Amino acid sequence: MGAGESCGMRIVNTKELTPLKWASPKGKFAGEGIEISEALGRQPRSTDLRERHPFDVEILRIPPGKAPYPYHSHSAQWEFYHVISGHGAVRHDEGTTALREGDACIFEPGQAHQFFNDGSEDMVLYVVADNPIGEAWYYPDSRKWGVPIPERQNIRSEPLDYFDGEE
């Protein structure tokens, strides 16, 4: 059997996949990702764990001088990162840590993080996430939540008394 042929195993070549590119309106955030798990058949909206896959794998490329995403945390998701090439830094709850090729780090649910490339060449990372059902994400700098239903939505609210609207 050749590459990609069915034997119960799925195979893709990441060099043949088209990266998803993004940039924020003012250009502060930019990046591109190769969604390996989705190319292997992962169905992110499914609640069937066989269709969702137990984890998601991405190759994330961050251009020089950019961060791919705002500073954020996840309500239930773990994320593992491995720097494949380039260098940069990661902002986290305790400060900022420099990263270089070969470094790996993990963030558990509730730990805010943001990667940025302070080098002159692209920073490339492998990202592995467990993508649990019911995940939401929080952006501490802008005090808003991201929720996946019905589509990705961002919301912001002010603190309310526990009984507000109940009596």
Regions found by a protein language model. Name each.
Residues 54-55, 59-63, 73-92, 129-130:
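Short, conserved beta-strand element in jelly-roll/cupin
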Residues 109-135:
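Ligand-binding loop in jelly-roll beta-barrel domains
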Residues 33, 54-59, 112, 122:
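Conserved beta-strand residues within beta-sheet cores
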Residues 70, 91-93, 116, 126:
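Beta-strand residues in well-ordered beta-sheet regions across diverse protein folds
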Residues 39-45, 58-74, 109:
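Conserved short histidine dyad/triad with adjacent acidic residue
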Residues 1-54, 136, 141-167:
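A short, N-terminal "cap"/entry segment at the start of jelly-roll beta-barrel domains
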Residues 94-109:
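Short acidic-glycine-tyrosine-enriched beta hairpin
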